Amino acid sequence: MSRIGRLPIAIPNGVTVTVSPENVVTVKGPKGELTKTMHPNIDIAIEENSVIVTRKNDEKQNRSLHGLTRSLVNNMVVGVTEGYEKKLELVGVGYRAQLQGKKLVLNLGFSHPVEIEAKEGVEFQLDGTNKITVKGIDKELVGAVASDIRSWRKPEPYKGKGIKYENEAIRRKEGKTGKK
């Protein structure tokens, strides 16, 4: 048995989990609703106040899908109760962020400002002009949007300029030493 997959997922109060015969898992909670189609070789059962994930047989693919499916369902339950957020920092002279409605506008040293539309289920918050918070209930979507924002200007190793995650450590390099 998978160490992760065999653990039951506790369903908190105010959260409902339903599984259709086609293995479509729907989780409803105070922050919203998430739906995801799971692999057909994995069985998902709801017993009392917990979700139990089992696999049909011990094929290698099913063993790897077992823990994955349990983690995906758990992420859905946590998402609709607490939500997820990723924090980004803009480091560099003239690097700024501002909100225009649901749109995030970044000045990153290009000849034009970069505009990023908020996808469905994701919202942006600003703390000053150089800290961005991406919030949502879908962990995968929040991470993808934060990664898209970061990809506009990844931190460079010499001065550390760019967009970095809040707790990310940038490996710094030394510049040229010059002739003596």
From Swiss-Prot:
The keyword RNA-binding applies. One of its GO terms (molecular function) is structural constituent of ribosome. InterPro entries: Ribosomal_uL6-like (IPR000702), Ribosomal_uL6-like_a/b-dom_sf (IPR036789), Ribosomal_uL6_a/b-dom (IPR020040), Ribosomal_uL6_bac-type (IPR019906), Ribosomal_uL6_CS (IPR002358). One of its GO terms (biological process) is cytoplasmic translation. The keyword Lipoprotein does not apply. Keywords: Ribonucleoprotein, Ribosomal protein, RNA-binding, rRNA-binding. GO terms for cellular component: cytosolic large ribosomal subunit. Pfam families: Ribosomal_L6. NCBIfam families: L6_bact. Part of the 50S ribosomal subunit. Belongs to the universal ribosomal protein uL6 family. This protein binds to the 23S rRNA, and is important in its secondary structure. It is located near the subunit interface in the base of the L7/L12 stalk, and near the tRNA binding site of the peptidyltransferase center. This is Large ribosomal subunit protein uL6.
